[in-house]
Regions:
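Sec-dependent N-terminal signal peptides
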Residues: 4-13
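Short beta-strand segments that buttress and anchor functional surface loops
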Residues: 25-31, 61-66, 94-99, 202-211
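Hydrophobic/aromatic beta-strand elements that line small-molecule binding cavities or substrate pockets
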Residues: 44-50, 78-85, 112, 220-223
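Hydrophobic/aromatic-rich structural module bridging two neighboring secondary-structure elements via a short loop
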Residues: 61-113
């Protein structure tokens, strides 16, 4: 459900597309809840780490979210997600563990490759599963880099197919991105090199190509800076939405490798 958080948290430097290795913390809360929703309160935290290795990027996210419903119910979601994407954007690995109310609901790992004619993803859980992929697939880092490139060129729309490996046996999603005109922040939030004066308002809609529906599965509204940092973003589901605000960010050391990107 919240696996979209990981790709949207990646930090990119436009100059040479140098990714900043970092440790970031986001606080999650309920943004809006419609009349038909039972959810009236959301509290959570996401801890994200990005590390540059010799041939690609290691990323990890630990998520803890509490939901409260109108009938005095409460549920807890815990998630640990790790990924690795090569600099070329042709190979991708993923590892996921999910728990709901301390009961494990997801536990799998896998990899995907789009460098050959027979592109596919392999999932390993109780057994091995193979999912074919279309040729024009992007993994999370590649997709976000291309969104930033489109914004730099003053393009208003960017469309792509993304594979995340966020659900067992899941294929790709079709993503439509609307890029708004660059704006200034009303106030300065962080005294940090990651924080800039300007941002692009972007809106992303995620569609399942296997479902004949014009309605997206979910949407994201975010403030995207030129260096790739997202200070705030909102995830819209059917009858409620969650807002995530950056609460802390720190630079961490890269591995001792020659910069090949």
């Amino acid at each position: 459900m919240f696996r979209i958080l990981l790709p949207i948290l990646l930090l990119f430097g436009i100059k040479g597309y140098a990714i900043e290795a970092h440790h970031a913390e986001y606080m999650l809360s309920l943004h809006e809840s419609s009349v038909g929703s039972d959810i009236y309160e959301v509290e959570g935290k996401s801890v994200y780490k990005l590390k540059k290795e010799c041939s690609g990027w290691n990323a990890s996210e630990e998520l803890l979210v509490f939901f409260k419903t109108k009938n005095n119910g409460q549920s807890k979601l815990e998630s640990k997600w790790k990924t690795f994407e090569t600099f070329s954007g042709e190979a991708y690995q993923f590892d996921l563990i999910d728990k709901i109310n301390d009961e494990r609901t997801n536990n799998f790992f896998g990899f995907a490759n789009i460098s050959s004619e027979n592109n596919n993803a392999k999932y390993f859980s109780d057994k091995e599963y193979i999912v074919p992929l279309e040729n024009l697939i992007e993994f999370p880092i590649t997709q976000l880099k291309n969104i930033i490139l489109a914004a730099e060129k003053n393009k208003k729309i960017y469309n792509s197919n993304i594979f995340m490996g966020s659900e067992l046996l899941d294929g790709h999603r079709v993503v439509s991105v609307i890029i708004g005109k660059q704006k200034k922040y009303k106030e300065k939030i962080f005294e940090d090199k990651f924080y800039e004066k300007l941002y692009w308002p972007i809106n992303l809609a995620y569609y399942n190509p296997e479902q004949e529906s014009e309605k997206p599965e979910y949407r994201i509204s975010a403030k995207l800076q030129k260096n790739g940092v997202l200070i705030e973003y909102i995830i819209f589901y059917d009858n409620f939405s969650i807002i995530s605000k950056l609460s802390n960010i720190e630079q961490i050391d890269d591995s001792n490798c020659v910069d090949t990107n």
